[in-house]
Amino acid sequence: MTEIILVGVMLLSTAGYAFFGGEKSNVEKLDYKGIKFSLGDDGLWHFLIQEQEFATTNNPKETENISSNINLKINDYSQKVLYFSQDSDNQGLQEIARNIERFTTRMWKACLDNCSEDLPIKNCSENIIIIRESSESLIKQEENCVYILFNENDAIRASDAFIFKILGI
């Protein structure tokens, strides 16, 4: 009798695992221009490019309406110092840093002109990203300065659009 109960428990355990266990199949996924995006438990969209993992708050479909007129690629930041203007939006800065800091030698805040903070003064001959609120969301470039302009609470989405652009997505 004990053997029958033991076999029954084993069968029910196996059936339970088959129906309710294992990997989640309801993970949200997106294939965008041949790149596979999956929404992780952390709420970020994870994807691989040349065996490098990236994680963004938004997927590329969610940033398609943000105009981008830049010709920079990730290699333009590789092994170089990347500056952010001292008044850059902090959420946008963190989104970009999470994804491209590993390619730079370091990231630093800087002033575009005199400022009250003790920061270096830089101009557009160096890589500088300026993330500011504006009347519309768009990304533009002047020499090596990239302006990520966002409307209202759109800093992260505009920053993600920049990330996708420099990654060639």
Task: Give short role names for the model-derived ranges.
Residues 1-26:
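Secretory targeting signatures
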Residues 39-169:
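Long, folded non-catalytic interaction modules
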Residues 22-40:
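Alpha-helical transmembrane signal-anchor/signal-peptide segments
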Residues 7-10, 28, 34, 124:
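Aromatic-residue detector
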